[in-house]
Amino acid sequence: MRILALNPYHSGSHLTFLDGWTKNSRHEWTVLTLPGRRWKWRMRHAALSLSRQIRAEIGRGGRWDRLWVTDMLNLAELRGLCPPAVADLPAVVYFHENQLTYPVRNATERDLHFGYSNFLSAIAADQLWFNSAFHRDTFLEALLRLLTRMPDYGHESLVSDLRLRSLVCPPGIDTWPDTGSRSAGALRILWAARWEHDKDPDCLFRALERVQQRGVAFRLSVLGQSFAELPECFDTARRRFREQIDDWGFVDDRDRYHAILARADLMVSTAVHEFFGIAVAEAAAAGCIPVLPERLSYPELYGAEPDFFYGGTATELADRICALDSQLQTARWLELQAKAIELSSRFHWTRLAPMMDDQLQHVDRRRVLGERAMGNGHTAEDATD
């Protein structure tokens, strides 16, 4: 099949996802993109800008069987701006995130127009794909709350139709070579996330202070992209843990990033927001033992091993790290490491890409709003069962 993929924010996880799928797919792909910056402006103009790219591709002979777009594009607008050859294609919207439940520091900062654009895009799609069941459920619940607040014509009844057309299709990761046995030394702790408040880095550093006070030796790698408004705790932590730090900051070289993951023992998350957690999946595939708060998408993805979780506070995280340190290189440690690798193997592209290829092939154009798209009854959600 010939697939037209539109990625209005072509950077970070959005780029990595599409690159991984297309490399492992049996379909033929045309990928049209816009740079991954200024997300609000991208959401405003993406339909117009990409429709012009599409017309140019059609002029060069482009023809497609399916349309695949991300949540950063208003599909309803795009259908209106494109010729029938594209406007009438069966279409999937993939939700990496959404603008109703994506975190903001202050509730007054949320522009509900972008969330409503997500709604219109979903209505225009034949299927909605989410990276986790947690994401699907929280989005649809928030959408229903939003629509019931409208003064009239809220169209709340359409939310149940969207749920029927929603599938869980987690992002894939590359297969990981055997890293061999662990080298000697202190416990190696990894934290990899955006350096923003919704990842709660302060919880990590408060927990590490407690670990240090208990006399547990550790090495530390703190990775991730930083922005203009950097939480103050990073500068404080860099000074406090300067003797323990091995890696600090954003790593744009994939080989170096993989090497850091391969030598780490624990992958710690302190997130208060996470729709999937690709960094955790990659670290687990490398043999890191996940240390996760018992919330968000994590229980859905890693709940088969209770010892991967802590209660969510800095004290509970410190307790979990110290408990794992006492098990370093024991039989239980090796069991946990093997379980992490096993659970993450569900997300290998070699497994997920064929399943998503199949699902895309079974997407049909709905003729009437509210009519469920026909399919084969199997989805990429099976990969996480």
Regions of interest found by a model, annotated:
Residues 258-264:
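Short alpha-helical donor nucleotide-sugar binding micro-motif in glycosyltransferases
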Residues 41-45, 329-365:
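A charged, aromatic-enriched C-terminal amphipathic alpha-helix characteristic of glycosyltransferases
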